[in-house]
Amino acid sequence: VLAVNTLGVLYIVENGETVQSMADLKGQTIVAAGKGSTPEYALRYLLTENGIDPDKDVTIDWKSEHSECVAALASGQASIALLPQPFVTVAQNKIEGLRMALDLTAEWDKLDNGSGLITGVIVARRDVVEANPGAVDSFLQNYAASVEWVNANNADAAQLIAEYGIIEAAPVAEMVLPYCNIVCITGSEMKDKLSGYLQVL
C-alpha cells in the first residue's frame, strides 16, 4: 500500500428528520447495498460501538445494488438508507426532502480509536516499488498535488471528471466532490490509520 486515497464516502440518508445521531437508528429499517464488504462492516461496527445490536436493534434490508436503495427511497418503500457518494447526491437530486442525516466518516472519527474509515488505497507490487523508488516518489508527489488541486478547485475538477466519464454531468460531480473525502495519506500516518482500520475489521 502506497497511500490512502479515499476516506469514508458512506452516509446515512433519510427522507425525514428522525435520524440525528447513531442512537436514532435503533428500531429503524435501513436499506443498504454492499453486504459482505466495507458498507456492511462499517455500519455494523458503528452500530455496535454506539450500543446498538445490528442483528436485533435494527433491520438492515440488503439490496444487490445502490441503485435499488435509491429506488426504494424514491418509491417510499424506505425512508432511511446507507449510500455512498455519488449515489447520495444523485438521490438527493431525484428525491425531494432527502437529506444526509449522518456522515459515517464523522461518526467513525468520534470514536477516537486511532483508526479511520478508509474506502480506497493505492497499491503497487513490492518488486516494482523497490526497482523504481524515484518513479514511485514522483508519482506520490504528483498524486498529492492532484488531490490538493481537486479539493481546492471543485468546479474545474468537475469538468474533467465529466470529460473523462467518471461522473456523467459536471454539475453533479461538483456537488459530490466535497463529500468524497479524497486524500493522499502516506508514511506513518497511513500505516497508523490503515492498521487501526484493519484491526477494527
Which role fits each region the language model picked out?
Residues V4, E17, V31-P39, D61, ...:
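Extracytoplasmic/periplasmic, Sec-exported soluble proteins
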Residues S67-L160:
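Pocket-lining segment of extracytoplasmic ligand-binding domains
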Residues V1-D55, I60-W62, S79, Q85, ...:
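Short, glycine-/small- and polar/acidic-enriched structural segments
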Residues R44, T89, S195-Q199:
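Predominant activation on well-ordered alpha-helical scaffold segments within soluble catalytic domains
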Residues N50-G51, I95, G165-I166:
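A broad structural signal for alpha-helix termini and local helix breaks/kinks
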Residues V129-V200:
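Secondary-structure end/capping motifs
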